[in-house]
Amino acid sequence: MSIPRLPHQWHHLDRRTTLAQQGCALHRYLRDCVLPFSPHYRALFRERGLTAGDFHSVADLKKLPFTRKEDLLPTPENPRRTLDFALAPDAALLARRPSVMLRALLRGRARVRDELEREWRPVFMTSTTGRSTEPVPFLYTRHDIGNLGLGAGRIVEIGGVRPDERMVNLFPFAPHLAFWYMYYAGLDRNVFALATGGGKVMGTEGNIRAILKLQPQILVAMPTFLYHVLQLAAEQKLRFEGLRILVLGGEKVPPGIRGKLAALCEQLGSPGVRIMATYGFTEAKLAWTECPVAPGETPPGYHLYPDQGIVEIIDPETGEPVPDGQGGEIVWTPLDQRGTVVLRYRTGDRSEHGVTWEPCPCCGRRMPRLVGKISRVSDVRSLRFQKVKGTIVDFNELERALDDLPGIGAWQIELRKAHDDPLDLDEINLHVAPAGDVPQDALEATLRETLHARFEIRPNRILFHSPADLRALQKVGVALKEQKVVDRRPEASSGPAGGGESLPPPRESRP
């Protein structure tokens, strides 16, 4: 049963009306889609003594236990565990539903059979990147692909992209959400869009040629890869005139990288570009976007789509929902998905200021927004630089600090063990490609002062590279995602670490 949606009024409803409609949609979704056809949640609800009748409001979600990524991973006892989260409809049960019988009478059995196939049969898949665990596949039906286009098209709408404008999608071609989301964004809003497949498909030079030939107004990419594309084009003294909006995703987008990208665009002949950061994750089959803002302006937060799902913010320690405007962990529940479905999914991502329902200061839309920085819990690591104690390093903030420092074009953090001994102390090497006219000695001093003052880190080595060598180190155009943080520490059971890049000798500075 398809849940009624509000594609035209989705951004004009007040908080009370939106929450009431979400509560009704949640009840119907559980009753008609999830509990009849999800092996995992049918068993979970039975075990907890719950039914769809226990859920009539967003607040009722507290009755439902969280789903975590670990719940989706295969086990020796259940190697196909992920499929327990995929909706597997019973054809006989569907055929007996009064709504289906009525549709068959009005439209004919063959047409309704085709409609049910399109709604329920998986035909597409994306997967998690496998950064922290093995990749987890998420199945889509044609119904889900329609929702994918609906959500992606809202990025085009919020960005104010006109039908006569052109987009170039530089996201890497892979079964990952970012590439396909922006692929369907152009289709949904009938906007011309070229998907290059990123650096691994066409190479950095190939992407530059595509931009030169198409002369787009909108570029869509990961920030690090886009920086390298623009920086190389600037080295070659090319012109990318007419760029208006940069849509960024897949990585953090701190103020420093916004400013560097805008400065490169101006150098290439496109002053005044505005930037839209997006936030999404595979498990949501969805991504949200900011309004376009100029570098230096405070981003207004990510516009959520309340007709497609519920975003809760919880205290990560207690699991309790927090008030609006308070930070916490992001939890996701869909309202209209088929294929793979997860309820109350704990993302491990923390929103600095949680959800606000105040009208957006940029566009005036009244739907909820995620406000402030978003950080991944898994990016907080314990490192042992001394014999006596460890140091907790928040790599979320460390990456932002490096991106925000003037004089740095690109960088890579390399984690190693002293003497390649897995039982020895941790070491940090910082690889840097300078930008601008900051003297190397001054840049080194600034880096050491900043890292020690803010993070209690003293890099073992700071190594300076040319932009081309740093591109090779980050595997630009080789890896699906540029490598900004590389952990080469050997496991205690393994031999010495390897895998370093063969580069021209860098200009090295030691503490």
Question: What residue spans do the PLM features occupy?
Answer:
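Nucleotide 5′-phosphate-binding alpha/beta core
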Residues: 1-127, 133-150, 158, 426-431, ...
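Active-site phosphate/ATP/adenylate-binding loop shared across adenylate-forming ligases
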Residues: 3-11, 68-276, 284, 288-294, ...
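Detector for glycine-centered tight turns/loop "hinges" at secondary-structure junctions
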Residues: 133, 237, 318-319, 480
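Short hydrophobic segments within beta-strands
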Residues: 170, 248-249, 431-433, 483
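Generic structural signal for residues in well-ordered beta-strands
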Residues: 193, 275, 311, 411-413, ...
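Conserved beta-strand termini and adjacent loop/short-helix elements that scaffold enzyme active sites
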Residues: 196, 278, 314, 416, ...
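AMP-binding/adenylate-forming catalytic core of the ANL superfamily
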Residues: 219, 331-455, 460, 480
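Conserved AMP-binding/adenylate-forming
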Residues: 253-359
